[in-house]
Amino acid sequence: EDFVRGQKVLINESNEFRPGSISKLPVGILTIRDLDSGARKLTDTFAVQNSLKHSRADAIGRLPPGSKVQIKQYLEELFRVSNNSAQYHLRVMQGGTQVLNSRTLAELGVGSFSEDPHVSAPNSVGKVFGDIYRGKVFSPTWRNYFYDTLGSAVGSLKDAIPAGIPKGVRVVNKVGFLFGGKENTYSDAATVFANNTDY
């Protein structure tokens, strides 16, 4: 979608797919909405639990159980390195999958965008990205926080859409990939801040 001109190109937009780590976006976005409303603060903490560690090797997984981790660190790990342990802790902090799915539908207006069931559709992800751009999801301050945090993801998470964009053009993206078994998928969703328009 060309956000400035209002033009769209839609191909298989309603075809559901397994989004991989793109499914981290709802819990991150809804947590930022809580920060935006004042319901939570970046300095609020949630204790590390062994049962919520995806790996003992990541930054959250290396911490002993009971460690008080700030929401700020969970969000940075979630967006910058796509940390699964951060996702699992934020999910439980938010009340679990059913709560998140209900809020995703009620607050973001999409039903096909979740970790469990692990399914999404291009038009759902696109709607959320478009609504964030248009200021319907966050206040300007927290929209900038979202763009800055997700936009600072490590280089290995910028091998899809950003790789095809000219240098100097800002791209804020979230990749999702599933390798092994019956699944081999690599997906990406992005907002591109171009010279004459934004997408």
Question: How should these model regions be labeled?
Answer:
Residues 1-5, 63-65, 71-75, 86-199:
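Penicillin-recognizing serine hydrolase domain
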